[in-house]
Amino acid sequence: MSLSILMVGNSLTAANAMPTMLAKLLDAQIVAITRGGARLAEFSNPLTKTGSRVLQALDGDGTQAGHGCFVIAQDMSHLPATNPSAHERAVAKMCELARDHNAAPVLYGTWGYREGSAKLKKLGMSAAQMGQLMHEGSLRAAAAHGAIFADMAKAVAQMEDADWFYAADGVHPSPAGSQFVAQTIAVALRR
């Protein structure tokens, strides 16, 4: 395997074993460090359990060595839309950490929630509004810090019918949705 990848994120990353799907698409070795509900800021903070695990992975398992190493980072499901400045700070720290370990940083930007979902109603915005804010917040953070950008918000917003993409909760991806996420990330890495 020529690629080694560290993926960090929450249940949107872990759902349906998406890192395994991506590993198969890229013929890569992927170490996934996930925690449900986690914010990206945790993963670059060595004082947190997840941050400590990230440092161990970068320092100790070979993910930092060799050609074609990536750190793929995913933030809390709504943070780019609801607190873009906190999102950008977290992306900046993760990009710095990746580069300190000779890895290319990749931002896996997530999507807006499905129209009518309970979590979207709680945020008080439409699916289109959330999708646009997710796209803008993540694009801005990736561009400001030189990260490769896998833009799932834009990809999902452009679907004529995105119902197949979502699990029943309207937030997480379905198995087919996770496969689409893996394919979109793979395309971004191959550019």
Task: Give a label for each model feature.
Residues 106-109:
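Short beta-strand elements of ligand-binding domains
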Residues 68, 111-113, 185:
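Tryptophan-centric aromatic hotspots in well-structured domains and transmembrane helices
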Residues 3-8, 12-92, 97-99:
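Conserved SGNH/GDSL esterase-like catalytic core that processes O-acyl groups on lipids
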Residues 29-31, 104, 146-148:
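Conserved beta-strand segments of alpha/beta enzyme cores
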Residues 76-85, 113-127:
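Surface-exposed cleft-lining segments at the edges of enzyme active sites
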Residues 17, 76, 95-103, 139, ...:
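Sec-exported extracytoplasmic/periplasmic mature domains
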Residues 34-40, 112-115, 152-157:
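Acidic helix-start/capping segments at beta-turn-to-alpha-helix junctions
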Residues 118-191:
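Catalytic His-Asp segment of secreted/periplasmic serine-dependent ester chemistry enzymes
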